[in-house]
């Protein structure tokens, strides 16, 4: 098992090499919106998992997840060759591509926060005109005054 720090360094290097190759060297149009977000290398340095996101061509267009996955699978051999040449390790790790779900989870969290803000605003509007259900001081007994003169309520 390799040093965890070495595995992290190798993962970062692999991520940089693959991202650069996708952007500048591989000419598949399905990879135009693909971004490598993270990489993890196994403890024995034989397997590398690369996480990616896909952006649409425009803000209104949905990303092509299937096309990007197929293009990454097709380019896996070329990318592994580039990783081997760029890292200089004895055994070039096998590459596995996994779609990153963090942006989807972040979008879902933003929706939940927006819903909570809207509920808070509705509650603030309802509270604005509301009055107490009973007397302003519900603990005061009508007509009973404090006879000992203390303000703390202690009768010693």
Curated annotation (Swiss-Prot):
Report residue spans for region: Disordered: 125-156
Record's compositionally biased regions (Basic and acidic residues): 125-138
Subcellular localization is given as: Cytoplasm
PROSITE patterns noted in UniProt: RBFA (PS01319)
* Keywords per UniProt: Cytoplasm, Ribosome biogenesis
One GO BP on record is: maturation of SSU-rRNA
- Pfam families in the cross-refs: RBFA
**Broad class of where this protein is predominantly found:** cytoplasm
Q: Name one GO cellular component term.
A: cytosol
Which SUPFAM superfamilies does its entry note?
A: Ribosome-binding factor A, RbfA
Task: Output compositional bias ranges, type Acidic residues.
Answer: 145-156
Q: Which domain of life is it from?
A: Bacteria
Any one Gene Ontology MF annotation carried by this entry is: ribosomal small subunit binding
Q: How does the record describe its quaternary structure? A: Monomer. Binds 30S ribosomal subunits, but not 50S ribosomal subunits or 70S ribosomes.
As for family, the record states: Belongs to the RbfA family.
Role played:
One of several proteins that assist in the late maturation steps of the functional core of the 30S ribosomal subunit. Associates with free 30S ribosomal subunits (but not with 30S subunits that are part of 70S ribosomes or polysomes). Required for efficient processing of 16S rRNA. May interact with the 5'-terminal helix region of 16S rRNA.
Which NCBIfam families does the UniProt record give?
rbfA (TIGR00082)
Q: What is this protein called?
A: Ribosome-binding factor A
């Amino acid at each position: 098992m390799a040093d965890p720090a070495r595995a992290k360094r190798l993962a970062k290097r692999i991520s940089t090499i693959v991202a650069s190759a996708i952007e500048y060297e591989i000419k598949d149009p399905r990879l135009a919106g693909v971004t490598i977000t993270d990489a993890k290398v196994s403890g024995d340095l034989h397997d590398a998992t690369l996480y990616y996101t896909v952006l649409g061509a425009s803000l209104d267009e949905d990303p092509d997840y299937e096309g990007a996955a197929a293009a990454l699978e097709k380019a896996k051999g070329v990318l592994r060759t580039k990783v081997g040449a760029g890292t200089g390790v004895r055994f070039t790790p096998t590459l596995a591509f996994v779609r990153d779900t963090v942006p989807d989870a972040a979008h879902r969290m933003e929706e939940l926060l927006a819903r909570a803000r809207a509920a808070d605003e509705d509650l603030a509007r309802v509270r604005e005109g509301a009055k107490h259900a009973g007397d302003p001081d519900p603990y005061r007994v009508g007509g009973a005054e404090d006879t000992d003169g203390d303000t703390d309520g202690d009768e010693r």
